[in-house]
């Protein structure tokens, strides 16, 4: 569960991200800016997901750091984390990059970084191909270059996620 909050008063909250490694229900509190924070709370199999999105259960977790007078819930949403790594990123005139080619759990913060690296590796190749300086085979090398990197980060993110989600 993620909960985005807007604050009137943030005196008791730090300007950095905090991980609470609770054995039963880990919580991450992310610094967004001076007036906003995101809370990420693990949903347990025994939890009623529909009930969890209501404000009363949410405030139960938020009350550890804030109260209703100092903050407003702007958004709450259930997320599922998973890993996806496509086997083929290039076919005919279609080239995959970023989340369409690979999806990483958020535990290392490398998902968008990997997408940016994909685009950087692809941009000069596409320019060369468009100007007839590179062949379609040269475009295909893009996956061979990027695949080992994203594969390693996805595996590492999944392992870090196991530690953070099951600290006991």
Language model features with spans:
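Core Rossmann-like FAD-binding/catalytic domain of the broad FAD-dependent monooxygenase superfamily
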Residues: 1-168
